[in-house]
């Protein structure tokens, strides 16, 4: 496992018990809106199988199961996050439609074309090769299915970007310090992590690697004054 992956393991293991309570802090309390918009992008009828990667505590998986009676394989590499998710799923009464899977996005334990749609959240900043990871996600997606993600974004406007920097570098670490050492570390890490990712992979480059991974009709929607983004694409013939 690479140092990037080991760091992600340590980071999320420390915040798993309080992730659903504190998580909105990291997204300006916009994460629920981003999840709903991402789910609206996938083409999955009731009874479909959807793979949710980097599922964490199951926020996306539960929304899928609740809103569309979809069956979900919720995959994450972190056992602590999956355990917290299993507890939350039981409390929510998921009706047995969510199956937790321990695994890595780069080596999915599923056959080709196993899923009608694939979603992922806050994933590509934590992998060594985003394009190869997208190829692997596309491998398990059926032809014609949709791959969709939500991720943090760096606002473009100078005033909004200045506010974003102040929030990520000052406000989040201060609140995280009040919560726990693990949350303080996570809050300090997030802003620089997002900025570094977008410096290396600006949006046109992200679109390019999605297309190079075999996804077509790639669409983007920037949300919440530029703080979040949803990207989606379809697997199949680019002319259709």
Describe the function of each predicted region.
Residues 117-130:
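A short SAM/SAH-binding and catalytic strip from SAM-dependent methyltransferases
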Residues 106-117:
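A short acidic, Gly/Pro-enriched loop at the edge of an enzyme's catalytic core
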Residues 213-240:
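Core SAM-dependent methyltransferase catalytic element
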Residues 145-152:
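Conserved beta-strand signature within the Rossmann-like core of class I S-adenosyl-L-methionine
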Residues 6-7, 154-209, 213, 219:
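C-terminal alpha-helical "lid/dimerization" subdomain adjacent to the S-adenosyl-L-methionine
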Residues 131-143:
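A short glycine-rich, Lys/Arg-flanked "PGG" loop and its adjoining helix->strand segment in the class I
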Residues 49-107:
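Class I SAM-dependent methyltransferase SAM/SAH-binding core
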Residues 28-46:
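Conserved alpha-helix/loop element of class I SAM-dependent methyltransferases that forms part
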């Amino acid at each position: 496992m690479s140092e990037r992956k080991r760091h992600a393991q340590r980071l999320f293991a420390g915040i798993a018990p309080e992730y659903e309570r504190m998580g909105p802090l990291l997204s300006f309390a916009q994460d629920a809106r981003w999840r709903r918009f991402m789910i609206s992008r996938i083409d999955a009828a009731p009874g479909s199988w959807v793979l949710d990667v980097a599922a964490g505590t199951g926020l996306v998986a539960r929304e899928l199961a609740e809103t569309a009676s979809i069956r979900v394989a919720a995959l994450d590499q972190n056992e602590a996050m999956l355990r917290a998710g299993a507890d939350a799923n039981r409390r929510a009464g998921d009706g047995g439609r969510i199956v937790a899977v321990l695994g890595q996005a780069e080596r999915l334990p599923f056959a080709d074309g196993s899923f009608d749609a694939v979603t992922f959240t806050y994933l590509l900043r934590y992998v060594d090769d985003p394009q190869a990871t997208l190829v692997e996600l596309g491998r398990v997606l059926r032809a014609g299915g949709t791959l969709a993600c939500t991720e943090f974004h760096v606002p473009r406007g100078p005033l909004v970007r200045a506010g974003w920097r102040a929030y990520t570098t000052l406000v989040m670490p201060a609140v995280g310090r009040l919560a726990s050492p693990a949350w303080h570390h996570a809050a300090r890490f997030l802003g620089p992590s997002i900025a570094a990712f977008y410096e290396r992979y600006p949006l046109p480059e992200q679109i390019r690697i999605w297309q190079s991974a075999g996804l077509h009709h790639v669409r983007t929607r920037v949300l919440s004054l530029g703080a979040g983004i949803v990207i989606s694409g379809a697997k199949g013939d680019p002319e259709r």
